[in-house]
Amino acid sequence: MTDIEIAKSVELKKITKIASEIGINEEDIEQYGSYKAKISENVFEKVKDNKNGKLVLVTALSPTPLGEGKTTVSIAIADGLRKINKKSILALREPSLGPVFGIKGGATGGGKVQVAPMEDINLHFTGDIHAITSANNLLSSIIDNHIYFGNELKFKKVVWKRCVDLNDRQLRVIETGLSGEKNIVPRQDSFDITVASEIMAILCLAENITNLKEMLGNILVGYDEKDNPIYAKQLKAEGAMATLLKDAIKPNLVQTLEHTPAIIHGGPFANIAHGCNSIRATKLALKLGDYVITEAGFGADLGTEKFLNIKCRKANLKPDAVVIVATIKAIKYHGGIEKEKIQEENIEGIKNGIENLYRHIDNIKNKFGLNVIVALNRYNSDTEEEIKYIKDKLNEKGIELSIVEGWAKGGEGATDIAQKLVNLVEKEEDFKFTYSLEEDIKEKIEKIAKNIYGAKGVIYEEEAKQKIEQFKLQGYGNLPVCIAKTQYSFSDNPKNLKCDDEYYITIRNLELKAGAGFIVALAGKIMTMPGLPKHPSAESIDIDEKGNIVGIF
């Protein structure tokens, strides 16, 4: 059976029932049909004095084109904890339509461990991402309207981009304002994918609607004739934008196929943004459950670094344990084994590729000072000899390995890691950030590059050097740094998988996200608008005359 067929074969509980199981009354949710709901603001006030549960962060080794199943394992762990009678809640990101119709597919898990209704979640869900798109593009239209009606603020350069929640490389560089009308000034522009929009980051970092509005007002939109920054609040745009986001700021409640509550909210990418679900969703889940399972995008060098240095710093949180998801296929891929031979037993390939996993373990355990366990997401092609080799090697390093078979067995396939996590979260940690906010912008970038990526150093292109000095002069030198780079390698070169030679990270430019409260450093050739593959997933997605959807995975 396909994922969507498995999902449709399960009878879901009414969302009112799921809400009641975690102490939320029917009047405190806003239902979107029978199986989806928004959690109202009243709940935040009601649970504010509850004791926090334990926070478990799920990450992965460097991703491969084969997929590692991080969301699948996250769901399996939450279901597994319920199997051993622990009150667990999921706190995940919302899928973007770009990957759903592109190459990666959806983000609702797979097999017997999925969040549901999967086709709704993977498509429009409750409209959060569309609301973000509208707020983003409203700001663009307000900027151009201001320029049209006299340009009182003396815009010389507009840095704010429009967005759309699709992969569309044609929109990377465009020309706007070509109508020839008086006062419409043509200019070169571009689109970002919505999940890379600063408004997505703001939604995920805002504590409440008041904080949201303040952050929206602080968005840098352009520069005047004297190179002074111009902000959204100078255009009086923040109120209208916040109004568009009044429902989007409320976390969404759904369930797994085994009826574990799942709070799904926000969805920035981790390669081009900070890669975590919303602070509001995570904090709410911690008040409602004893164990909260959340994830950070891509590998531990990207999503986890940003989860810890950006999200946890802002929210005053820290994980009680970190799960690194690995697959034997991925380890062999990092060991140089071709995709066509990846399912064949190959101890030598594992021996060559396990270094990638070691580096992520070292970062979590020693660089961040956190408890760590490895979850091996098992496939049918994995052999006992391969599993034993990995287990023995991790034992030598004092790291526990748990075999997770959630895809095939549901929560029953994750009871081992669930029990191990119950023990692990009670161990003491010595959590530390990679850098302090008082350090120079370059120092922050270099600490991430050297300590987390393992680079020899950092090379700054001229535009990047200028931006660093400019942002410091503007008073933004104390912001955290969000490095945008490829997810496939510790380096900024996606083809450099082993990273066993000396390499440097090249920072070509920086972008100030004054509203979200961080600086983006662009490394390598990272794009903020992806393109579709030659044969996108969209080709296999269809709907019949009865409304049944096929092809989403």
Walk through the language-model features, giving the residues of each.
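Flexible phosphate-sensing "switch/lid" loops adjacent to ATP/NTP-binding sites
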Residues: 1-553
